[in-house]
Curated annotation (Swiss-Prot):
Catalytic activity: folate(in) + H(+)(in) = folate(out) + H(+)(out); (6S)-5-methyl-5,6,7,8-tetrahydrofolate(in) + H(+)(in) = (6S)-5-methyl-5,6,7,8-tetrahydrofolate(out) + H(+)(out); methotrexate(in) + H(+)(in) = methotrexate(out) + H(+)(out); pemetrexed(in) + H(+)(in) = pemetrexed(out) + H(+)(out)
Extracellular topological intervals: 47-86, 140-144, 208-212, 294-306, 356-359, 419-426
Disulfide links within the chain: 67-302
Oligomeric form and interacting partners: Monomer.
Keyword Hydrolase: no
Protein name as catalogued: Proton-coupled folate transporter
Gene Ontology, cellular component aspect: apical plasma membrane; basolateral plasma membrane; endosome; endosome membrane; plasma membrane
Function comment: Proton-coupled folate symporter that mediates folate absorption using an H(+) gradient as a driving force. Involved in the intestinal absorption of folates at the brush-border membrane of the proximal jejunum, and the transport from blood to cerebrospinal fluid across the choroid plexus. Functions at acidic pH via alternate outward- and inward-open conformation states. Protonation of residues in the outward open state primes the protein for transport.
Source organism of this protein record: Xenopus laevis (African clawed frog)
Residues binding H(+): 160, 189, 285
Positions of glycan attachment: 60, 70
GO biological process, one term: transmembrane transport
Keywords tagged on the record: Cell membrane, Cytoplasm, Disulfide bond, Endosome, Folate-binding, Glycoprotein, Membrane, Symport, Transmembrane, Transmembrane helix, Transport
Amino acid sequence: MVSPDDSPEIRDRPRPRRCLLPASVTVEPVIFLSMFALALQGPLATQYLWDRLSADIGFNGTRTVGCAMNGSKSAGPEQQEVETLTAHWSLYINLGGFLVGLFSVMLLGPWSDKVGRRPVLMLPCIGLALQAAVYLLVMYQELHVGYFLIGRFISGISGDFNMILAGCFAYIADVSDRQSRTFRVAVLEACLGIAGMVASIIGGHWRKAQGYINPFWLVFAVNLFTALYVYFCVEESVKDKKPARLFTHRHYQSFFRLFTVQGENNRRRKLFLYSLALLVVVTVHMGAKNLFVLYELSYPLCWDSDLIGYGSAAEHLTYLSSLAGLRLFQLCLADSWVAEMGFISNISGLVVISLASTTPIMFTGYGLRFFAMATTPVIRSKLSKMVEEGEQGALFSSVACVEGLSFLLATGLFNSLYPATLHFMKGFPFLLGALLLLIPAGIIGLIEVCEQKPMYSQFSEIS
């Protein structure tokens, strides 16, 4: 039975905007607010783990104790134990969210191709709000940090932040044409950077002034507000909605069909190669990002909350500078070569950071990475252009799974490697990340060169 509102005449009528925003503004506030909450929560959660685990083992250290040991080459054994415990608990907590979220995203993405994008944008916002509520409960009751896993489990069931990313990028793919898609995707990623920069600056000062509780209340409120924004202000982008069951194996089939059905122009091979490139890029990005705070907290940098906030702001500023650079270089270069320039920027910055022993050198490394985030919009856009309109949700859910797997690899590899290499080179994980980035740089360059060869052969035949 079809309700009156679902009749073709009513469904095709233009619907008025439900909020006072320009028509060109769609899901940008969703990704901005969600990233703001995540960027505010992330460094504070790491610092809370440090403080709680320090108290549990009786380390009254403050991190400046290890920094003031007569210029000693390394921190004391207690501080190294705290670093190791913090890195390991970060691994356990992130692992819990990934394992649950992997199956949720594989269901929700293809489901959104049928029922629309709005439900899969609201659900993870609510899940992230509940996660913040669990974190608040742990802090109020001073429970063991292992209870953070409950919050990550709840967030994972609802799709987590990766589902918000997938939903927003699929939405932009729905409403943009092929020519403007790369830049529209880059705008979304710039929203990630601006939100992260603002949250990082606020978070450091706020924690220093009032502790952890009040910032996490803001995280809770922002996630709830984002869900309300989606409900009242985001118009549906899927043109032909139809009812569909959520829990069915067909969604998994749609997911895997992308990589098993051979399309035109070696589509399957290119999807696999671009996904592999994205896997490595995001693994290095997440792995380095997870360690930045821990690297800055400990000897020899020994940053306080203010400097950590400025460092995180500098890291997120790369999203904005990469957007400007992408727009500029697109005027004279193909997207693939713009991505190659992003790799050069990222690799050089990570090498400098791996050797940083003073604050100016650390910020120099951040500065060299000014164009580092130009690679991911190019890869997302190329992936989106390879599939049909009705496959965007399945595609970006696969991208979300790749990013979730990247997060798992990043936390497993980098968080385990960091304590294992403390005794000979603290910055070794960043150096390893720079080397790993040579793999996607080679993949993207090779595909671009191979795609140009037929064009040259056609010219030679004509001549």
